[in-house]
């Protein structure tokens, strides 16, 4: 299938972007990854992981659901 050379397809534009980026492959992407990750460090990792805990949220939700069920018996829901 031939296309008009003045029109670029999505693939061709991606190839042109890659060629103009001066990256020859995956190995050249490694410094990009390392530079963005190296700024954070791991010293604050335990604090970040602690902030991600969802156990308390789930416990509070279960307690609220239980409390709602006690306040409104099942026969009133129908």
UniProtKB/Swiss-Prot annotation:
Residues 33-42 have a biased composition (Polar residues). Keywords: Protein kinase inhibitor. The record marks 23, 26-27 as: Important for inhibition. One of its GO terms (cellular component) is cytoplasm. Residues 1-78 are annotated as: Disordered. It comes from the Eukaryota. Residues 1-10, 53-78 have a biased composition (Basic and acidic residues). It holds the Pfam family PKI. GO terms for molecular function: cAMP-dependent protein kinase inhibitor activity. InterPro entries: cAMP_dep_PKI. The keyword Transmembrane helix does not apply. The keyword Zinc-finger does not apply. One of its GO terms (biological process) is positive regulation of telomere maintenance. Extremely potent competitive inhibitor of cAMP-dependent protein kinase activity, this protein interacts with the catalytic subunit of the enzyme after the cAMP-induced dissociation of its regulatory chains. Belongs to the PKI family. This is cAMP-dependent protein kinase inhibitor beta. It comes from Homo sapiens (Human).
